[in-house]
Amino acid sequence: DPKDKVLKPKYYIWYDLSPNGKKIYDWASGNAGFKLSNYDGKPEIYPTVPMDDGNGPEGGKYGKYVKLTTSDTGAWGVIVNRRLAAGNLFIGVFDPMPALTNTLLCTRFGLPFSKKPLRLTGYYKYKPGEKLQDKNGKPIEGKIDRGTIYAVMYRNHDANGNAIVLNGNDVKTNPNIVALAD
């Protein structure tokens, strides 16, 4: 695939396969943002990685799974005050360009749909991190980290007909949201 040859990322990029076997890049993760702090790191240390170690759903009966980990961004993260990178996987696009000015604008959630979804099924396990910290890296005593899973359906044009895309700032609060499962 030409896109694979141009990007040559050192992290995992997620995609679906079309009926004729072509890659459809409709999934995104923040791995491109983590690359800013981990230029030469191996793909396995990124926040969002595939796993096939027998620990998946029902003892590995269903094969591979995605491991999402909150990762330390090291010295670079301390300097720019972006100390953590959360593992995530979503339908949409991740653009690392605003990472230093407004991290929440990096995520652009969603793709157009034309049918009403009936259900979303899946399996997950969650293990909280050892400590919860504030944006300055100081531990928050007495609180435990929480993972989140949510689905959002929204109108992709505002009342004036302008195209919109939700991002990390408004993914759960935008007035164009028509359904939210959290």
What do these predicted ranges mean?
Residues 126-133, 139-144, 157-160:
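Extended, low-complexity, turn-rich repeat/linker tracts enriched in Gly/Pro/Ser/Thr and Asp/Glu
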Residues 121-125:
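Short edge beta-strand/loop segments characteristic of extracellular beta-sandwich folds
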Residues 1-119, 142-154, 160-182:
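Aromatic (Trp/Tyr/Phe) and Gly/Pro-enriched flexible surface segments
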